[in-house]
């Protein structure tokens, strides 16, 4: 069993590519869908993610995992891997960054997390409760890896939903551009400064919600 596989790969990428950060590019690809969860009184309580990993990462992650039926992996079979991966993602803030009325918000540790395996791909499901549930007229959420070791792309169908939100709330998703020109400029700057700590920000998926 690979303990904290995703976290270990992230650390290896960040540390191993430290001298080559000007050439940052993704090594893991995730197709994401998310839900912003509201309480009956209109309070935002958290974010529910479903992250489907690329086939190559999924295959590698499952190497050495024995099951009763070859090629079939139940939630129970995948539970240890789900737990260790969720724990390892803590230091990366779960790649989820929220602001309400412009003020940064913090998340508690994930709940209701599990892995499932369908059609050759692993999907990690997790819910991030807000440390302080709140009502906000303006809520901004970004999902990305600052080091750009992981590329997040939101699904074409139902990429983001509001669950239990007041009917008048308006949701927008701004997908990242390819960032080619910006990346080249930033690469040149990073080559001089050696800083690539927030390279992935230009590839962030930006979600905004406005409620009256």
Residue ranges and their predicted role:
Residues 56-134:
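Structured domain cores in non-transmembrane regions
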Residues 101-212:
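Mature, soluble, non-transmembrane domains
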Residues 7-16:
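Bacterial N-terminal signal peptides
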């Amino acid at each position: 069993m690979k303990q904290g596989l995703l976290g270990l790969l992230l650390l290896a990428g960040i540390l191993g590519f430290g001298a080559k950060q000007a050439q940052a590019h993704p090594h893991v690809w995730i197709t994401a869908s998310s839900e912003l969860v509201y309480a009956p009184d209109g309070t935002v309580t958290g974010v529910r993610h479903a992250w489907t990993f690329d086939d190559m990462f999924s295959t590698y992650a499952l190497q050495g995992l024995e099951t009763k039926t070859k090629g079939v992996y139940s939630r129970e079979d995948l539970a240890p891997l789900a737990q260790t991966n969720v724990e390892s993602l803590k230091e990366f803030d779960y790649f989820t960054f929220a602001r309400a009325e412009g003020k940064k918000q913090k998340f508690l540790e994930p709940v209701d997390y599990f892995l499932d395996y369908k059609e050759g791909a692993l999907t990690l499901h997790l819910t991030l409760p807000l440390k302080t549930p709140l009502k906000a007229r303006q809520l901004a959420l970004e999902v990305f890896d600052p080091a750009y070791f992981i590329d997040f792309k939101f699904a074409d169908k139902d990429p983001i939903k509001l669950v239990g939100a007041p009917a008048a709330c308006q949701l927008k998703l701004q997908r990242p551009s390819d960032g080619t020109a910006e990346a080249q400029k930033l690469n040149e700057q990073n080559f001089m400064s050696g800083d690539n700590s927030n390279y992935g920000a230009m590839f962030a998926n930006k979600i905004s919600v406005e409620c009256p």
